[in-house]
Every structure is written in C-alpha cells, then in structure tokens.
C-alpha cells in the first residue's frame, strides 16, 4: 500500500538551498504572503494569473524573470505553474491576467512551457484532500538582458542557466488546498 498524499514529507522551499542573493520586494493586489490564494487564480476558478509588482531591485539589474513553483506537488521535482522570461528592466509589474498569452506581456518578454504543457499560467490544482500546497511566486533580477533562450527551453534548464546571473530575488508565497469530495 502506498503512502497517502497527505503523509509524505514536506518539500523544502527550493530557493532556501540556492546561493544567497540580495532581496527586493514583490507585492500583489491579488495575493497575500502566507495566505490562501483566491479561487480566481486556481485551475478550477479561471486560471487567471495574479497581479505582481516589484521594487527595490539592484541598480545593475538588466532584466527579470517571473516564476510560480509548487514544491508540494506529488512529484519528485515539484510543479512549475508559470515562467515569464526576458522581462525588460523598465517593466516592474505584471497585470492580472498577463499569464494568458505572450500578447499580454511587455517588450521582448515571453512564456516558457509550464509543466502543464502550455506557454501560459496554470492555476493552483493540488489533488483533492491533499494538504495545502505552497505556490512560490518569484521575481528574479538578472545582470544580463537575456539568456538567449527560446520558448522550447525547459523551465528547469532556464532556472539553472539563470542562477549565475541572478543578483537578487523577491518571493511571495500563497497557498491553496482542494477540498476532499
């Protein structure tokens, strides 16, 4: 008999194990750090990406990338819900719904394919009855304007390549739990 979902160990926050970097601030009109996300931003509630706005990043920042990662997904490697890369330094926010299409993004920014298979935001969708999952929304400040990746680059590979260029990071963590039926 296998382990029940709720009984598995809590996954670590993946950013706590990375080399230290400076921090800055990310806020949202839609999410509050440590609190449940509104249903609008879940897979069953509309799949609408939340508003994010950031400030206080280092002067040497040349671009950003934004991601949403669920370390609590019942997989060996968590679940990437969203990644937008090549965000110009002049862009310091993403509007609610910007995750629906590259057409909603500024300048050269574009989506990488998430673990759900599409180039867009995919809302919270933990298994019914599992404990609350953490959704870590991260804004990464990079010291280069682009890594030269295309939209077929995997999120894990992009994150790996971006590590040596990340000079600061801001995170906001929301939670969500799908009730048991």
What do these predicted regions represent?
Residues 1-181:
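N-terminus-centered regions that define maturation/targeting leaders and the start
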């Amino acid at each position: 008999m296998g382990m029940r979902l709720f009984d598995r160990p809590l996954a670590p926050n993946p950013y706590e194990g990375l080399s230290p970097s400076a921090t800055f601030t990310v806020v949202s009109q839609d999410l509050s750090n440590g609190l449940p996300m509104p249903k609008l931003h879940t897979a069953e509630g509309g799949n609408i990406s939340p508003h994010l706005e950031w400030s206080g990043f280092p002067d040497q920042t040349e671009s950003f990338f934004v991601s949403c990662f669920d370390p609590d997904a019942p997989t060996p490697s968590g679940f990437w819900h969203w990644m937008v890369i090549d965000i110009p330094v002049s862009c310091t926010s993403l509007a609610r719904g910007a995750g629906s299409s590259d057409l909603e993004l500024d300048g050269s920014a574009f989506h990488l394919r998430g673990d759900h298979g599409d180039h867009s935001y995919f809302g919270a969708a933990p298994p019914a009855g599992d404990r609350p999952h953490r959704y870590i929304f991260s804004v990464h400040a990079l010291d280069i304007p682009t890594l030269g990746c295309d939209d077929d680059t995997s999120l894990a590979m992009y994150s790996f390549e971006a590590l040596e260029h990340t000079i600061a990071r801001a995170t906001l963590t929301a939670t969500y739990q799908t009730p048991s039926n």
